[in-house]
Amino acid sequence: MFVTFICFLACLTCSYGQPRAQQYVVPSAKLEAIYPKGLRVSIPDDGFSLFAFHGKLNEEMDGLEAGHWARDITKPKEGRWTFRDRNVKLKLGDKIYFWTYVIKDGLGYRQDNGEWTVTEFVNEDGTPADTSLEPTTAPTPVRPDQPNQPIPTHRPDPPCTVSATMVDGRKSVCQGTLLFSEEFEKANLKDLANWEAEVKFPEEPDYPFNVYMVDGTLELEDGSLVLTPKLLESRFHAGILNDALDLTNRCSGQVDTTECRRQASGAQILPPVMTGKITTKNKFTFKFGRVEVRAKLPAGNWLLPEINLEPKDNVFGSRRYESGLMRVAFAKGNAVFAKKLNGGPVLADTEPFRSLLMKEKIGIDNWNRDYHNYTLIWKQDGIDMLVDGEKYGSISPGEGFYALGREHAVPHAAHWLRGSVMAPLDQYFFLSLGLRVGGVHDFADSPDKPWKNRSNKAVLNFWNDRDNWFPTWFDANLKVDYVRVYAL
């Protein structure tokens, strides 16, 4: 691959020569040594369609060779094109030799003969790291007359202040530690080791009008997870909605229940839409922390993004959100609702308590127009909600969510007395990313809605209105660029 790429660059150089290089100057690359390990290289976005980084550690490049690092980046993040090596452990005095390449307006441009020396370390967020324990000079090179011994590369671990965050399976974690990172840069869904796909008919408490499947609904594309809603008939055959569908062989729900097998009967047709959902339920669960997700929400009538924290064990009950749910980002796909962003906990299935604790931010534009950074900070004494770095709400339990639930006649609020002041949000939760359609709780009945929430023909009436809602699904994907979890 890299031989082909270098030949391509050579051709560009021959064809356009120095005059083209004078027409555009590639922005200088910013290199950062991440503490305790890692390298980040970035340039500001200037309308590029590709950014490539090629470099060597402590060894000069031989012309336009591929180097130890050779990576093509096809998508910017947060206004910058970024290459990241999370495993390399750099030392003060280390030198990186490199060249970069960009494609702008269909033409290629290089920045050659780059050199950079490690003089300091930074944290993940770019702030200076505490280097009081670092060596102040580069390791002394071995002279030819000295025994050929390896140069020490170990640096003392930084001081650790134990965090309130807890990770299932670990004794303790340090404050500010990056605990979980998914950049979705794998080639295949099977390579997502920390996630498992749902295959089932979702049921209570919201009874959405979709079935979770894998084929055609979950894809990795240009470093993002893409979840796509599709009509069930497109996967099977016309008339499938009045037939039976058995998912038992791959079902992630409870076998021998309607979560895994459905038989249509009269107005009770099969869910007409198939979508995707993945979770870390059996891979990564935690209690308290900062969750950051960069995503582009779906646009289209009756579509609902699922960027959530869900309870691992349903300690306080498995119905009606008795054990809670936390929404990192939630905006309905209908154009009339799309400027309203909501985030926070859901502790009951019905209104008014269902939405009482959710925070709202009205956007200048629809939230589904572009990618945004959504953050939920889950603490021992409350929850903070942020979007693009701006806080738009805080949720405090006060004397406990039980008191508020009892005030609103929530029948299961008494269960929370078994926990702390944050109950039911004081247990282990997992990450979930999915796409839902319709359902019986998220959309209030109105003249424009084709179904009534309490009607036994809700799914059928929704399906019969497809000529109105399906044409609005021209940008219906939920796209997730990354998911990160940090210790408090």
UniProtKB/Swiss-Prot annotation:
Entries under InterPro entries matching the protein: BGBP_N, BGBP_N_sf, ConA-like_dom_sf, GH16, GH16_GRP_C, Glycosyl_Hydrlase_16
Domain GH16, residue spans: 144-488
Tissue specificity of this protein: Fat body and hemolymph.
Record keywords: Glycoprotein, Immunity, Innate immunity, Secreted, Signal
Subcellular location: Secreted
Signal peptide range: 1-17
Sequence ranges of Pro residues compositional bias: 141-150
Effect of Y101A: No effect in binding to laminarin by the N-terminal domain
Organism domain of life: Eukaryota
Record-given protein name: Beta-1,3-glucan-binding protein
Species this chain originates from: Plodia interpunctella (Indianmeal moth)
